[in-house]
């Protein structure tokens, strides 16, 4: 795509034009004191030319850009708020889990201690019984 412009038009245009690549951008060139010439790339390689003013594509583009920016900002804030809620929920559940684990560990320790005492008593009774049998056998 070849274009030729005078030096006055090219001043400030920088790299607004491209060849072959898909880009979504716009560039503005100041032509006169109050006139602004805008080049907006639209779909593949077609370009739209507009003078800045009421009811042209630049105003629509600015409005759409602002709406998109506001939408993204709102959604980002919502996502951050949801992330905070999720973090608070996880912290709450972790503390509940720690409390539950502590209580269950105490119950398990008490159970093991009780069963240990029962086993010791049975062992003592068994030993006493065997000792009594041995004593009787030696008589």
From Swiss-Prot:
Residues annotated as transit peptide in the record: 1-40
Organism: Arabidopsis thaliana
Protein name from the UniProt record: Protein COLD-REGULATED 15A, chloroplastic
GO BP, sorted A to Z: circadian rhythm; cold acclimation; drought recovery; heat acclimation; leaf senescence; plastid inner membrane organization; protein complex oligomerization; protein homooligomerization
Induction: Accumulates in leaves during cold acclimation (at protein level). Strongly induced by cold in association with a gradual irreversible decrease of H3K27me3 in the promoter region. Expressed transiently after moderate decrease in temperature (cooling) through the CBF signaling cascade, thus leading to an enhanced subsequent freezing resistance. Accumulates in response to high light, drought, high salt, polyethylene glycol (PEG) and abscisic acid (ABA). Cold-mediated induction is light-dependent and light-stimulated, and requires functional chloroplasts.
Keywords: Chloroplast, Lipid-binding, Plastid, Transit peptide
Subunit structure: Forms homooligomers which interact with potential stromal substrates in the stroma of chloroplasts. Interacts with the galactose headgroup of the chloroplast lipid monogalactosyldiacylglycerol (MGDG).
Compartment list: Plastid, Chloroplast stroma
Role, per record: Exhibits cryoprotective activity toward stromal substrates (e.g. LDH and rubisco) in chloroplasts and in protoplasts and confers freezing tolerance to plants in a CBF-dependent manner. Protectant against various stresses (e.g. cold, drought and heat stress) by preventing protein aggregation (e.g. LDH) and attenuating enzyme inactivation.
A cellular component annotation (GO) from this entry: chloroplast envelope
């Amino acid at each position: 795509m070849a274009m030729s412009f005078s030096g006055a038009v090219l001043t400030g245009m920088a790299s607004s034009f491209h060849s072959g690549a898909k880009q979504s951008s716009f560039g503005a060139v100041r032509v006169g004191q109050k006139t602004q010439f805008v080049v907006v790339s639209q779909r593949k390689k077609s370009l739209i030319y507009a003078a800045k003013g009421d009811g042209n594509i630049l105003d629509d583009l600015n409005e759409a850009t602002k709406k998109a920016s506001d939408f993204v900002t709102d959604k980002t804030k919502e996502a951050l708020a949801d992330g905070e809620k999720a973090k608070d929920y996880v912290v709450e559940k972790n503390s509940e889990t720690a409390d539950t684990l502590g209580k269950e560990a105490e119950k398990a320790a008490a159970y093991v201690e009780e069963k240990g005492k029962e086993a010791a008593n049975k062992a003592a009774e068994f030993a006493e019984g065997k000792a009594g049998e041995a004593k009787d056998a030696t008589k």
